[in-house]
A protein has these predicted regions:
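Charged, amphipathic alpha-helical coiled-coil/dimerization segments
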Residues: 30, 80-138, 145-148
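Short capping segments at the starts of secondary-structure elements
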Residues: 56-60
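Short, locally clustered residues in the helix-turn-helix/winged-helix DNA-binding domain
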Residues: 23-26, 51-55, 116
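Residues within helix-turn-helix
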Residues: 61-62, 73, 80, 100
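The alpha-helix within a helix-turn-helix
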Residues: 65
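N-terminal leader segment of winged-helix/HTH proteins
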Residues: 1-40, 134, 142, 147, ...
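Pre-recognition alpha-helix immediately N-terminal to the DNA-recognition helix
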Residues: 21, 28, 48-49, 110
């Protein structure tokens, strides 16, 4: 038995790492979405922004960044690209010029029905049942929420 397979080192194997499994799954699902989004001119990050706006149009840029789990500085180039594609527009309310609201254009709203087939195709590509996908999503959200709470506690202590 090599050192790497002894019980004390088993948890150090790459294939045993949760972070590695999550990274592989993230890359695979992003590529799978990407292939299907490419004909629409969207990448995965842009698609997530569009999903958030289809749910709630007119979000502030800061709220939108939080909603899609991006830093505001990472959201800006995505919004510029979506604006260049005439899918969104950024506006400043007259009563608060410091705030930037992101609104869908007619073209942005019209794009939503085209994405239903993409969702189905990606779900089918996973090979998981609807129930398995729902359970996986729930576990991943629970994991993210728990780790975020832990990070918040660590930040409060520091």
């Amino acid at each position: 038995m090599s050192d790497q397979t002894t019980p004390q080192f088993r948890n150090l194997l790459l294939e045993e790492q949760l972070c590695f499994a999550l990274c592989r799954a993230n890359r695979a699902i992003t590529r799978t979405f990407g292939r299907r989004l490419e004909p629409m001119g969207l990448n995965h990050s842009q698609y997530l922004v569009m999903l958030a706006l289809w749910e709630e149009n007119g979000l502030s840029a800061s709220r939108l960044a939080a909603r899609v789990n991006l830093d505001p500085s990472s959201l800006t180039p995505i919004l510029k690209r979506l604006e260049a594609m005439n899918l969104v527009r950024r506006v400043r309310p007259k009563d608060n010029q410091r705030t930037v609201l992101v609104r869908l254009t007619a073209a942005g709203r019209d794009l939503q029905p085209c994405t239903a087939d993409i969702q189905r195709a990606v779900a089918d590509a996973t090979g998981l049942s609807g129930e398995d996908l729902a359970q996986l999503r729930a576990v991943l959200h629970k994991l993210a929420d728990t780790l975020q709470k832990d990070e918040d506690r660590q930040t409060d202590v520091a």
